[in-house]
Amino acid sequence: RIQPLDQSTVNMSDFVISSAQSEEERSRKLHEIIDSIQNEVYRKLVKGMLIHAGRKFIEYPAASQIHHNYLGGLSEHSISMVEVCQMLCKHYPQLDYDLLVSGALMHDIGKTAEMSGAIATEYTLEGKLEGHISIANGWLTEVAAKEHLEDCEETIFLHHMILSHHGKMEFGSPVLPKLQEAEVLYLVDNLDARLNMLSQALSSIKPGTWTPKLFALENRQFYKPKGKE
């Protein structure tokens, strides 16, 4: 007999494509990242925006297609970017760690309102008409006002990180990166997205063969060397 299931008792990652990292691992990493932010303003802003998103930040994909388009993809992408930024901050000590990490963690948080759900997601009316950059920027304004931080320089900087992270106006950013951390954020975002697209494409073909043309990678094909699994 067919009976409805209590969704709270079901692990959806058992049934759909999902992040290779468990939800518990991503949640643990998220808390560690927040604890690593020493600047009190950035930490309050990040925590406030995560409250806006709730569990959606952990559960949602980063896109309906293209990259990290699976259960948990948004948090996987954001955490991966933070980890790259942490390495870059060690190599380039002139970078503001707290700003760069906060920007990496929050840059796509508006996607939790831009998309309709964690599985078989579509773009919401708000998502289509406003986009995740505008949505996240609005949330940041609300959180900053609630915390009485709207006049802090850090708040202005985090606004800029969110607004400029697509790197170019023709890619959807209303402003170009004008802080060194914003330039790094744009480059790391692009790197992480492209490598995820390549990983997915290469994992689906046999060694010694080519991927189909990848639209998001300038319609190029990529070769999987023999001996690679």
Residue ranges: model-predicted function:
Residues R1-Q3:
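Extended acidic/polar, glycine-enriched regions
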Residues L5-Q7:
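Flexible glycine-/small-residue-enriched beta->alpha junction loops
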Residues T9-L129, C152:
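Acidic/His-rich, divalent-metal-binding segments that scaffold phosphate/diphosphate chemistry
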Residues E23, S27, Y42-R43, T155, ...:
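Alpha-helix initiation and N-capping motif
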Residues I66, E76, M87-I205:
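Divalent metal-dependent catalytic cores for phosphoryl transfer on phosphate-bearing substrates
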Residues Y186, W210-F215, K226-E229:
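N-terminal intrinsically disordered, cationic/polar leader segments
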Residues S199-L217:
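Compositionally biased, low-complexity linear motifs
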